């Protein structure tokens, strides 16, 4: 397993991490088996969120006795200091840990990011928690390119998480800017929320970009983990055949895949089209149709 330094945090993490959304559909014992398999294979970065129902709780059980071997990241949708402080304490309890390595502001559109940074905003609680040793570092996750651009200019941002995959590569220049500014870049949605079925080609594509610090595919069983490990541990250049597969995937999804650019807005019926598409992509890993 290749390891990278997660930007300004200085944390040494595996090139592939563990995305904690799919474990909502298994159980605590299944999560424990996955955690031990991660440890055996050198995967040391785990991502979850307050909003992922039982994910934090399952991970807290699954990491019993081995917590110190992992870099643990979670996130909250809270925008005020009071709500964020409560969420940090809940995360600590759920994850059965005295500290969380990386705590992230979850999916903040530009207007919310301004609230987070304002007096009484969530950043106050995150900074206080960092001073108290409850969390180690502060990051942000986003689906908006404008949020990504804004985050790059904020001195307190140590990591940025954003969708990046074969069909969603519109942030490539911003990802390169992360590398130049020593901001860790975390690639989420490497399979485009399940739209890309060829996981090996998808992960190989993401890891071919040297500016990506870590990719975090979701996994619900050992078979998925083994498949993802084989892809990420293959450091050979992309082959002509793989490049052809990538073009075919882009062609197949290019006219129907939502990139959340919002060029389709405003909707005459008042529907947030990109929000609906995002909800569908989030439901897919949970087995919802």
Pin down the residues of each PLM region.
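A general structural detector for well-ordered alpha-helical segments in enzyme core domains, enriched
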Residues: 2, 34-35, 58-62, 87-91, ...
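Conserved, mostly hydrophobic/aromatic
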Residues: 6, 18, 46, 59, ...
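Conserved residues at the C-terminal ends of beta-strands
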Residues: 19, 49, 103-106, 141, ...
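Glycine/proline-rich, positively charged
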Residues: 26-29, 36, 40, 79-186, ...
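Structured C-terminal cap/extension of enzyme domains
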Residues: 39, 43-44, 172-289
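Alpha-helix-loop-beta-strand connector modules within alpha/beta enzyme cores
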Residues: 56-75, 123-132, 180-182
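Short hydrophobic/aromatic-enriched beta-strand-loop microsegments
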Residues: 69-72, 157-165, 236-242
């Amino acid at each position: 397993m290749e390891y990278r330094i997660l930007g300004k945090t200085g944390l040494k993490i595996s090139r592939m991490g563990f995305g904690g959304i799919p474990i909502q559909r298994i159980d605590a014992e299944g999560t424990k088996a996955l955690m031990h398999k991660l440890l055996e294979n050198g995967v040391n970065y785990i991502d979850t969120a307050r909003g992922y129902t039982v994910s934090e709780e399952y991970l807290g059980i699954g990491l019993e006795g081995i917590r110190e071997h992992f870099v643990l990241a979670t996130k909250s949708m809270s925008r005020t200091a009071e709500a964020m402080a409560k969420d940090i304490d809940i995360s600590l309890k759920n994850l059965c840990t005295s500290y969380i390595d990386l705590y992230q502001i979850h999916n903040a559109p530009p207007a919310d990011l301004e609230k987070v940074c304002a007096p009484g905003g969530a950043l106050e609680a995150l900074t206080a928690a960092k001073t108290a040793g409850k969390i180690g570092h502060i990051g942000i996750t986003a689906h908006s390119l404008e949020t990504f651009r804004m985050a790059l200019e904020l001195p307190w941002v140590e990591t940025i998480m954003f969708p990046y995959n074969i069909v969603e590569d519109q942030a490539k220049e911003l990802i390169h800017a992360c590398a130049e500014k020593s901001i860790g870049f975390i690639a989420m949605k490497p399979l485009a929320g399940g739209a890309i079925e060829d996981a090996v080609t998808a992960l190989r594509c993401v890891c071919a970009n040297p500016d990506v610090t870590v990719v975090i595919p979701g996994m619900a069983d050992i078979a998925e983990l083994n498949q993802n490990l084989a892809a990420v541990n293959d450091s050979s250049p992309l082959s002509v055949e793989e490049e052809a597969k990538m073009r075919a995937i882009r062609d197949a999804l290019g006219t129907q895949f939502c990139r959340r650019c919002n060029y389709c807005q405003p909707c005459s019926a008042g529907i947030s089209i990109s929000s609906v598409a995002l909800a569908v992509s989030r439901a897919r890993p949970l087995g919802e149709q």
